């Protein structure tokens, strides 16, 4: 079934609520035959949708699938660009790897790769990202910004702002940003963001932003080494969270912030990022490849670099593990 027809059919059922819709009404709305309507409904059933059919009444949607799917993500997605070209797989080694391959084959800006499970998910510095089936959001977004190479780190901070805003809209949960790419709830990691670039000489060909979100994990779902430092949206909310809704809200927030960025530059993003960031104005320890620095975090500069006031002066921190306090 074509994605647009599938989306339109699900929307018809959702608008009808508990009421039946006749096959003829669906046929007219979708612009296809009654036989085609039946085939489309069978496709939805294969995806896990429970559709009741009653003679002389028509069809009604009883239950949506519990698992993440392309249809669930597409339905209700209100973006113009981000996520409109969607690649969904139940299992991938890494959404980031697949997104790189797609970008190399001229995938358009806004292409989104989503997996229900990753077998080789990774975060910053090639660290393993625990991404089990059925509980999280594992996705990678392809961008093609016309910006200088040195400005690409700004997109990590833009993504962090969009994730914070999207989570609040989707689940009503307030989160904090820990420089440069971690989203925390009560000091525990909930989201990781990985930004990678494809470039030729001084030209950005594409930027791939990977986002991993712990959505419905419970404490026992985490490996022992993560139980004390990781949490999920569900644990914070005290209820199960709709993963498709989280994706949709984040994509919409990202699209708005990205449009602001391409129109007005980094300043609006910088101000938002600092308003959500932990530790600005307080002491922190930055562990870098060139040593460990301790000092007061002043904020970020116009390139998104962390400014740390130390006894030796202001240090620019480009990449580091941060310890607050």
From Swiss-Prot:
Entry's EC annotation: 6.3.4.15
Domain spans labelled BPL/LPL catalytic: 74-262
GO biological process: protein modification process; regulation of DNA-templated transcription
Enzyme class: ligase
Family from the record: Belongs to the biotin--protein ligase family.
Binding site for biotin: 118, 122-124, 189
Protein name (record): Bifunctional ligase/repressor BirA
Gene encoding the protein: birA
GO cellular component annotations of the record: cytoplasm
DNA-binding segment(s): 23-42
Catalytic activity: biotin + L-lysyl-[protein] + ATP = N(6)-biotinyl-L-lysyl-[protein] + AMP + diphosphate + H(+)
InterPro entries per record: aa-tRNA-synth_II/BPL/LPL, Bifunct_BirA, Biotin_CoA_COase_ligase, Biotin_operon_repress_HTH, BPL_C, BPL_LPL_catalytic, HTH_11, Transcriptional_repressor_C
Lineage: Bacteria, Bacillati, Bacillota, Bacilli, Bacillales
Keywords tagged on the record: ATP-binding, Biotin, DNA-binding, Ligase, Nucleotide-binding, Repressor, Transcription, Transcription regulation
HAMAP family: Bifunct_BirA
Entry GO MF terms: ATP binding; biotin--[biotin carboxyl-carrier protein] ligase activity; DNA binding; transferase activity
Function according to Swiss-Prot or TrEMBL: Acts both as a biotin--[acetyl-CoA-carboxylase] ligase and a repressor.
């Amino acid at each position: 079934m074509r994605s647009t027809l599938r989306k339109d059919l699900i929307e018809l059922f959702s608008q009808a609520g508990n009421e039946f819709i006749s096959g003829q009404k669906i046929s007219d709305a979708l612009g296809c035959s009654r036989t085609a309507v039946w085939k489309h409904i069978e496709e939805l059933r294969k995806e896990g949708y429970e559709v009741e059919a009653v003679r002389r009444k028509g069809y009604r949607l009883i239950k949506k699938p519990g698992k993440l799917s392309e249809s669930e993500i597409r339905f209700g997605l209100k973006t113009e660009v981000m996520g409109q070209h969607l690649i969904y797989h139940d299992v991938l080694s890494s959404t980031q790897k697949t997104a790189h391959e797609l970008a190399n084959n001229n995938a358009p800006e806004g292409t989104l790769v989503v997996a229900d499970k990753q077998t080789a998910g990774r975060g910053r510095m090639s660290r393993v990202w625990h991404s089990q089936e059925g509980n999280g959001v594992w996705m990678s977004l392809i961008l093609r910004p016309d910006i200088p190479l040195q400005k690409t780190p700004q997109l990590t901070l833009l993504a962090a702002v969009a994730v914070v805003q999207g989570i609040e809209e989707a689940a009503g949960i307030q989160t904090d940003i820990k420089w440069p790419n971690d989203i925390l709830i009560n000091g525990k990691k909930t989201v990781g963001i990985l930004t990678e670039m494809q470039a030729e000489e001084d030209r950005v060909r594409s930027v791939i932003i990977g986002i991993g979100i712990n959505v419905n994990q419970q404490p026992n779902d985490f490996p022992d080494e993560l139980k004390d430092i990781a949490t999920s949206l569900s644990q914070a909310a005290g209820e199960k969270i709709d993963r498709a809704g989280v994706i949709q809200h984040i994509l919409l927030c990202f699209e708005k912030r990205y449009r602001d960025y391409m129109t007005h530059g980094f300043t609006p993003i910088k101000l938002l990022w600092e308003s959500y960031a932990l530790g600005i104005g307080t002491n922190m320890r930055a562990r870098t490849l060139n040593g460990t620095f301790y000092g007061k975090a002043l904020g970020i500069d116009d390139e998104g670099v962390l400014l740390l006031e130390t006894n030796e002066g202001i240090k620019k921190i480009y990449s580091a593990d941060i310890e607050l306090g």
